[in-house]
Amino acid sequence: MKQTAPALVSTEINEYILDNGLTVWLNEDHSQPKVFGAVVVMAGSKDSPNTGIAHYFEHMMFKGTEQIGTTDYAAEKVLLDAIEAKYEELAATKNSKRREAIQMEINELSIRAADFVIPNEFDRLITKYGGSKLNAGTSYDYTVYHNLFSPQYLEQWAELNSERLIRPVFRMFQSELETVYEEKNRRDDMILNRSIERLMEKYFHPHPYAYPIIGSAENLKNPRLSEMKRFFRTYYVSSNMGLILSGDFDTRRALPIIERTFSRIPRGVPDAAPTVRIRPFRGRERTTIKIPLPLLKAVALGFRGVPANHPDQPALDVAAGILNNSNGTGYLDRLMVERRLMGAMIGGESFNEAGFIGIVAVPRLSHTCRSAERMIWRELERVKQGDFTDEIFNSLKREQLRRHLTELEDIDSRSQIMVRLFSQGKTWADYREELARAEALTKEDVVRVANKYFGANYLFVKKKTGRYPKERLKKPGFAPIVPKHADATSAYSDWLDRMPVEEVRPRFVDFTHDVQTLRPADGLTLYITPNRVNNIFTLKLSYAIGLIEEPRLKLLTGYIPLLGTASLTFDALHTRLQTLGSTLDLTADEYSLTLKITGFDTAFDETLELVSGFVSGVKADDAKLKTLVDDARVANKAFFKSNNEVAEALFEFVQYGPESQFLTRPSLRDVKRIKGRELVELFRHAVRRECTAHYCGTLPAERVVDRTLRCFSPGPDGRIAAVAPYRRLVSYDRPRVYLYHMPDVFQNIIYVYMPCQPLPTLHERHTADLFSLYFGEGMSSLMFQEIREFRSLAYYTSGAYRLPPYRLSDLPTRFVAYLSTQSDKTIDALEVLDALINHMPEHPERIDSLIRTEINRVNNAYPAFRDISTRIAEFRRDGYTDDPHRALLDDIRRMTMDDITRFYQAHVCGRKPVYVIVGNAHRIDRRRLATFGEIVRIHHQEFYR
């Protein structure tokens, strides 16, 4: 094994190359009891343009191998070969009737082949050996397979993931292809998806980046297994792969395991792809894109950017920061703050072979696109001429440094950087050099790249209202492909079972020792967590007032950040914060309003003084309210173009009736009438509420307490006690189906709501967790297998029992479920889901896997150091005095299938659910739909204000 020199950026990354050429990156981090494991393959959609092969292959990599997922591969292979031949015939056939006949033959062969399939065995084995969050993703340039796992199962993880890459088998092909259709339908219903696809096509043609990752509908209809196998043989070779581990493992122990398992992957070098040159724009090239949003106008300027490894990237990042930054002091930010534009932002992406830079401008409703473009060019010219101060330039470099340091400080974010770097063909040493180049940047570098890339050759894009046609995929008449051995185990599984495993108990949050908890004043709880990684602090002040109690907070969080004080304008305040390397954010959720301050501990005192002055002296400006009005107008128009948002609102109404947040929220009329002083008074009231503060940094507790008390005092009257509202669930006396018609969408979204009785004991609550896993959470759940895996009736499914906080355990509970399906499959999906709810099948063989899944979820979700105090505060707010996962795991280890069955019979079986359906109602058989309950056609004014 050849070893490269180790690198060190905040945390040590060791790079190795195995004898077969596979690259390994190892990062030991013992701060959390988990390991992130990933395999990155340098092959993406650009290597199979417009076919969707790279993406569909990613799906098939979950179906097992010659040893995993089968009871008899030799017998199964005979049928799989016949299926492959039929797909070749299908791709060569144009006659529609003959194509239907071939597909039915494939269906019959698939049903026979399923007699040998053990569905989801790979997922079950990953779970059995400490895994959670199993997933994958396909990009233009690469594909990544990843999950978290408990450290004691490193050997099993390596065995499974290397086996997966050596001998994959493309079983259950037909049903998974239908699932990919569902995924495509789901994407096509997203309001901007088709528009972005058209823009990518215009921008990148003739490069493969011009085509969608998922592929065209035409190519998806004509899949060739032979092409997929060729793709695998070409790109899934050792020199084209990287193994990434970050977390709680011992490198010396891990290396021999990795060498033994991953060195088995065949050697090889992928074929060099032909270089496709993207021509430069010639002058101001024009195009339009359709977006189904009336009222809103928009323009965009698209410039040629740089590929991922280009040395100009750091300077371009600073140039972009001069236009947009986290403090809202960029030149484009100011156009919005001053209400000259409704929206303006710069963004971009650097792929491996090309990049793009886009600047989007949204004029005010009464202004023109031409005026918006002129404003954008004026600000670009300022950057090109060097019209920015050294202070701003240095502050943006400091902002980049802060971002890099925080990205490296925990396993989750650091591992994503490792994946990105490897996928771009970089080493960790390259990353260090990038940081050094960024630190060494000069103002002249930024001016040079601004003039180089923001020139007269660009793509001018104008939005027009409209939709692109979508190709409806007809529901196939296939019979379900239901394997007979759903709970069997393979010989390979038995072999893994014989490996010795060290017993390691999960790690729980310790309320006493993990953080310091102080109560320095009435109504103030201060959590202090030491930061031993860098010198960046966060101070979060969470006030006990949320959107449920005070819906106007939604407006407040959009308005207050636009203001200044009597002595400091918005621009002066945020420029000073920017110079210090600090940021200020204001957010609201159901139960709290949170002020989050971030910066370097060296600037802690000055940052808090600035924020304190703002909080106590914020000054109303009614002119800024017009921004809220414009935003509300556009949001109202956009809302009913998104089936996901409409379904969420209708489901809220079904659960909470008049207390739905979509009915209590301020209406457009309310927004027009509200005064600035009203929101400022509300803000001043909110920051006097009981406060839970979270400091994470390097400063001593005494100093943090002193500055917090001095800067954020509630005044002589003290803090106002929390109200802690909780909404009551709506009950129904008979089954109903709430139906909302959206004719332009492909996918119908289905929600299920079933109000249930309270669960006052911990044992009942724990059983509800296990029931949820069994019924509707994860790839091995009943819903996933019966609805998606066997029948291809949905891309995404979920079902779970939802509980109020433990302190309110005497309140009612509810069962909820969700799926989205092609509109003409709605009744089929409902029938399967309804059957599961009313006649839940029992699989006692799954109980051990369920318990293991729960243990893994607890262990692998132990928080990063910056999030520990927030987790403890949430537990305490819910009524716990210790980490509740400790009691949960002790309890479920003793549970059996009988516990799940008793829970189901007592709390779910026999209850009539309420269904919510949002989508194309014209493609639903109303007579069959009525068998699920009284059909209620509902108008949007009933559930959306």
Outline where the language-model segments fall.
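Metal-associated gating/positioning segment near the N- to mid-region
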Residues: 60-72
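M16 family metallopeptidases and their MPP-like homologs
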Residues: 27, 32-47, 53-56, 70-163, ...
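Carboxylate/His-rich catalytic cores and anion/metal-binding grooves
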Residues: 181-188
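A common structural junction motif
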Residues: 163-171, 261-269, 377-388, 612-622, ...
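Proteolytic maturation boundary segments
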Residues: 1-23, 250-292, 298, 333, ...
